Amino acid sequence: MACNAPNQRQRTLSTSGESLYEILGLHKGASCEEIKKTYRKLALRHHPDKNPDDPSAAEKFKEINNAHTILTDTSKRNIYDKYGSLGLYVAEQFGDENVNTYFMLSSWWAKTLFIIIGLLTGCYFCCCLCCCCNCCCGHCRPKSSTPEEEFYVSPEDLEEQIRTDMEKDMDFPVVLQPTNTNEKTQLIREGSRSYCTDS
């Protein structure tokens, strides 16, 4: 398609945000009512059904309709007023809510900041080692300020602890047998719970 029209210029994205207003013949701060009135007037004048002999009328009508669609949508209009047609393109690609973030990250100071941090950290290699890998999988991590005590339990001490726990459990025998249950038995009874056997 580009080979057929070598003299046709590729349309560039503007950042001024004025060309849609110029299509409708309005100034940049026009109200919604002015936009609607002008759109109706121009749409009737350039409608393809009213101008069947003029092939450019259909193209002009599409431009007018596109300008009206964008300028009557408040979020698209705010993006267009602030960033121009480039902002609308970014909104299509990344969403309306991410337009400000895109332009902030593509500003000169953000790019400069990324380059400086990248150079200072050795292409972010230091950040990766310190934050992600904790310097060689934890071998070089900084020592904690509180010393960790060595905790060792001998098998004899462990056996003695188990024996004393079992003896304590033998002091309180089970006096109630479990009740029969079926599918309709509730797992948790209504009312107060009692874990005491003295009742």
Curated annotation (Swiss-Prot):
Q: Which residues carry this modification: Phosphoserine?
A: S14, S16
Q: In what residue span(s) does the J domain sit?
A: 19-84
Q: Which domain of life is it from?
A: Eukaryota
Q: What post-translational modification does the entry describe?
A: Palmitoylated.
Membrane topology label: Lipid-anchor
Keyword set includes Phosphoprotein:
yes
Q: Where in the cell is it found?
A: Membrane
Alphabetized UniProt keyword annotations: Chaperone, Lipoprotein, Membrane, Palmitate, Phosphoprotein
Pfam hit, one: DnaJ
Asked if the keyword rRNA-binding belongs to this entry, the reply reads: no
| Recorded GO CC terms | cytoplasm; membrane
According to the record's subunit comment, the protein's assembly and interactions are: Interacts with the chaperone complex consisting of HSC70 and SGTA.
- Quote the protein name from its UniProt record: DnaJ homolog subfamily C member 5B
Q: Which organism is it from?
A: Mus musculus
The beginning of the lineage is: Eukaryota, Metazoa, Chordata, Craniata, Vertebrata
